[in-house]
């Protein structure tokens, strides 16, 4: 559960903080993934692609750090 404090009736900042916390906890991604049923084979493929993307990103970052 996500809790956000409202200070002095400032709804704009509260809404902004709420959206930021939702994004930080990957809430929107989970909602999007659960919208339709994903077969186990498609899930494995997607997770493998995400892992490969992370590895490429890490390799690129490591290459520029050296």
From Swiss-Prot:
Keywords: Ribonucleoprotein, Ribosomal protein. GO terms for cellular component: ribonucleoprotein complex; ribosome. Pfam families: Ribosomal_S21. GO terms for biological process: translation. InterPro entries: Ribosomal_bS21, Ribosomal_bS21_sf. The keyword Ribonucleoprotein applies. The keyword Membrane does not apply. GO terms for molecular function: structural constituent of ribosome. Belongs to the bacterial ribosomal protein bS21 family. This is Small ribosomal subunit protein bS21. The gene is rpsU.
């Amino acid at each position: 559960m996500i809790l956000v404090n409202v200070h002095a009736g400032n709804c704009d900042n509260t809404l902004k903080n709420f959206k930021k916390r939702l994004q930080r906890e990957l809430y929107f991604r989970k909602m999007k993934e659960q919208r339709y049923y994903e077969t186990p084979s498609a899930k494995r493929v997607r997770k493998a692609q995400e892992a490969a993307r992370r590895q490429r990103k890490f390799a690129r970052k490591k290459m520029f750090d050296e």
